[in-house]
Amino acid sequence: MKSGFVSIIGRTNAGKSSFLNALLNEKIAIVSHKQNATRRKINGIVMNGEDQIIFTDTPGLHESNKAINQLLISQAIKSMGDCDLIVFLAPIHDDTSDYEKFLALNPEKPHILVLTKVDESSNAKVLEKITKYQKFQDKFAALLTFSTKQPTYKKPLLDEICKLLPEHEYFYDPEFLTPTNEKEIFREFILEAIYENLSDEIPYLSDAIIKSVKEKTGITEIYASIITERDIHKSMIIGKNGETIKRIGIFARKLIQNLTNTKVFLKLDVVVKKGWSKEEKSLNQIIGY
């Protein structure tokens, strides 16, 4: 019996959240085409035979001078030391530069290099990319390919991961999908709805806070606030006649319902907290680190 923690690491938009959702066969992590959508660590539990793998989705590695982004980067780097194994995701169309930047961080834990999105490339191109990464073979414990759209890639990857995990009793009940508090997942779904329904800088200067969750027979009631930095942003989030916040609510509610399998009542309001994304105290309070 093995049980251990695996940090999913990669650049922004490398598909880390989609990777975790695919392994779980369930959506718990935020997915967006916009950069830096993942702000909090989300854990997912995958059973592979008698072995238990606890995956952690992390913010993407990138370069930025903004306080909020520096906090996210620091948490991703910290997670590399808090795990038993690292899985580094390298999209098949990328060159090796992001992987080389990862190696420059001198990760202490062993890692598996996973070439993702291989369904988007020909076999010849995949083999060519594998050859390019072979020059780093003394750095990684294994090199595998993966596609979230083709389930045949899942089992070989899980088997390889389990080879590198320690012998240990289960950390969690094998029936659990995630040890992450459901409020954290709900707020991530609201944030995803913000990313999908607003453009420009507004999503990056906004976040969500769950005020309360009430479980009633057949329905989950959620009361939440969207935090943003400026009054003009509040007006844009609400939209003309409340149309934008209505779209955000509908989008988020569908995501939550798919996870909870209950009807969901979601009440959103918007709160202005000036400069929250630039102040360490506010960042820690709102993002939760």
UniProtKB/Swiss-Prot annotation:
Coiled coil: none annotated. Residues 36-40 are annotated as: G2. InterPro entries: G_ERA_dom, GTP-bd, GTPase_Era-like, KH_dom-like_a/b, KH_dom_type_2, KH_sf_prok-type, P-loop_NTPase, Small_GTP-bd. Residues 116-119 are annotated as: G4. GTP binds at residues 10-17, 57-61, 116-119. GO terms for biological process: ribosomal small subunit assembly. GO terms for molecular function: GTP binding; GTPase activity; ribosomal small subunit binding; small ribosomal subunit rRNA binding. It holds the Pfam family KH_2. Monomer. PROSITE patterns: G_ERA (PS51713), KH_TYPE_2 (PS50823). It is found in: Cytoplasm; Cell inner membrane. PANTHER family: GTPASE ERA, GTPASE ERA, MITOCHONDRIAL. CDD domains: Era, KH-II_Era. It comes from Campylobacter concisus (strain 13826). Belongs to the TRAFAC class TrmE-Era-EngA-EngB-Septin-like GTPase superfamily. Era GTPase family. Keywords: Cell inner membrane, Cell membrane, Cytoplasm, GTP-binding, Membrane, Nucleotide-binding, Ribosome biogenesis, RNA-binding, rRNA-binding. An essential GTPase that binds both GDP and GTP, with rapid nucleotide exchange. Plays a role in 16S rRNA processing and 30S ribosomal subunit biogenesis and possibly also in cell cycle regulation and energy metabolism. Residues 146-148 are annotated as: G5. Residues 2-167 form the Era-type G domain. GO terms for cellular component: cytosol; plasma membrane. This is GTPase Era.
